[in-house]
């Protein structure tokens, strides 16, 4: 693993430090200020007649990003989590320690510097070193500074390198953290209680998806990594909680692309005595809150598309197919005509698809990508909404919506089905679909039906994909750009290093 000549040179330097009685992996030394705090606290130094303040002494830490050796002195750029600070080191102060530093220090090493603030002739506020310690010797050279880390695959597989070399990547994940904490704060302010439900399920449910399967040794049973927390959260509504939410991982054993990762984060929330129309208004308030928290304008650019949050609209499923998808009513209203139309358009349609699934195929191909501004699409076919409440006026549609922004689904919500007999029949229909070969059809969950039979109040529930939300609000083009360690196809580890020093 460490046979490369450049790595061997660095290992030799680490051993040389040990021979001098220095630990190349020190512990216990503390900084007094972050680099940003140092620059803020001592900004006044640049205005002094003699731009230095020897009475002040601070300790800073970070990774060496740039090293310029000049005989009896050197300038070093040291970066902590957020800020680069220049360090000046002179043989006059460090004596023999300076020789050791010149011999052993390299770009990538993590250091602690103790010294006083001063400004260079060019006016750059810096720290003049009185002590210098290598805290962690880097034995693998970092990618070259000016070209960064451009190999996309390597960036995802070795995210630590990506974070070191590309500061903008770190900014994305800081924004992700802010988005998640802001979503949590919003729901707490709205009176929702955060809960945690199981990650391993005896029966996968809550979504139409293929599960990951594991085995519980102590119980001697198969378990499924959860595809959604929905059925457990609704059990809590049965139990008497009236507003709950959960932010956590879901796992779906399916394909991967720029907007799908098999392990992803969602928020799901359930609200007793409310309807899906209430969820639409709640979602609008959530986005207003997030835009304000992130200091974003109501108009944002995503993938070269202008998204205007002031132009939010609501449209029914069939109206969207007609007015946006361009499919006439006489085609949409007849199953055989719709099938013929899809085939004429060159769309591969699986045999024996139900009318509702044919409508879904048409929607996916002709409508979804055109929904740029926030669009709540309502009145979904009941056949593709097995957990949603049946509409009182039209039993063929569900009291359900999906929110689309920038051509992608961001949220799914509905008035919940709380009739246990209807739910049992829909589960039976899903089982029949699974027996026909639909791997994503839902399983029968009699325990959930039994819970419903104890009475669940009228409830509205919704899920929002956190990863897609972060993509939208940060401008990331791939879901891999907003997940620190995304799923990747296995490759043989290649630890070879070509020095870029």
Swiss-Prot record:
Primary localization: cytoplasm
Swiss-Prot/TrEMBL keywords: Aminoacyl-tRNA synthetase, ATP-binding, Cytoplasm, Ligase, Magnesium, Metal-binding, Nucleotide-binding, Protein biosynthesis
GO molecular function: ATP binding; lysine-tRNA ligase activity; magnesium ion binding; tRNA binding
Entry binding sites for Mg(2+) 1: 402, 409
Matches recorded under PROSITE patterns: AA_TRNA_LIGASE_II
Binding site for Mg(2+) 2: 409
Organism: Helicobacter pylori (strain ATCC 700392 / 26695) (Campylobacter pylori)
Official protein name in the record: Lysine--tRNA ligase
Top enzyme class: ligase
């Amino acid at each position: 693993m460490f046979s490369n000549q450049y790595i061997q040179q660095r290992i030799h330097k680490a051993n040389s430090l040990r021979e001098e009685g220095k630990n190349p992996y020190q512990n216990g030394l503390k900084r007094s200020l972050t680099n940003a705090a140092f620059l803020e606290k001592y900004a006044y130094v640049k205005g002094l007649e003699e731009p230095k303040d020897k009475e002040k002494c601070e300790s800073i830490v970070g990774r060496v990003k740039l090293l310029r050796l000049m005989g009896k002195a050197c300038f070093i750029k040291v970066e902590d989590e957020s800020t680069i600070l220049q360090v000046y080191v002179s043989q006059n102060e460090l004596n023999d320690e300076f020789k050791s530093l010149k011999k052993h220090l390299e770009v990538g090493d993590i250091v602690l510097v103790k010294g006083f603030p001063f400004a260079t002739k060019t006016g750059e506020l810096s720290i003049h070193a009185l002590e210098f310690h290598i805290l962690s010797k880097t034995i693998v050279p970092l990618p070259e500074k000016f070209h960064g880390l451009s190999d996309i695959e390597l960036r995802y597989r070795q995210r630590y390198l990506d974070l070191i070399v590309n500061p903008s990547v770190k900014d994305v994940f800081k924004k992700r953290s802010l988005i998640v904490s802001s979503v949590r704060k919003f729901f707490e302010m709205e009176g929702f209680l955060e809960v945690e439900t199981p990650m391993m399920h005896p029966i996968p449910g809550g979504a139409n998806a293929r599960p990951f399967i594991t085995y519980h040794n102590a119980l001697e049973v198969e378990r499924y990594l959860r595809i959604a927390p929905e059925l457990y959260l609704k059990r809590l509504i049965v139990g008497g909680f009236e507003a709950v939410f959960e932010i956590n991982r879901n796992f779906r054993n399916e394909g991967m692309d720029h907007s799908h990762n098999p392990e992803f984060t969602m928020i799901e929330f359930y609200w007793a005595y409310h309807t899906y129309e209430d969820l639409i208004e709640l979602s609008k308030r959530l986005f207003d809150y997030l835009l304000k928290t992130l200091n974003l304008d109501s108009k944002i650019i995503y993938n070269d598309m202008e998204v205007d949050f002031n132009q939010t609209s609501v449209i029914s499923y069939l109206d969207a197919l007609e007015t946006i998808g361009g499919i006439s009513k006489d085609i949409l209203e007849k199953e055989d005509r719709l099938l013929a139309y899809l085939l004429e358009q060159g769309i591969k349609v699986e045999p024996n698809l139900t009318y509702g699934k044919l409508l879904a195929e048409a929607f996916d191909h002709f409508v979804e990508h055109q929904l740029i501004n926030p669009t709540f699409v309502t009145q979904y076919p009941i056949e593709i909404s097995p957990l949603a409440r049946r509409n009182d006026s039209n039993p063929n549609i569900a009291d359900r919506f999906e929110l689309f922004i920038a051509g992608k689904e961001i949220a799914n919500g509905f008035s919940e089905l709380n009739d246990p007999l209807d739910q049992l029949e829909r589960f039976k229909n899903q089982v029949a679909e699974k027996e026909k070969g639909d791997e994503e059809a839902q399983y029968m969950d009699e325990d959930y039906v039994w819970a419903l039979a104890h009475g669940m109040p009228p409830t509205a529930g919704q899920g929002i994909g956190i990863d897609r939300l972060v993509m939208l609000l940060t401008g990331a083009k791939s879901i891999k750009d907003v997940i620190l360690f995304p799923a990747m196809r296995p490759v043989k580890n290649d630890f070879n290093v070509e020095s870029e020093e």
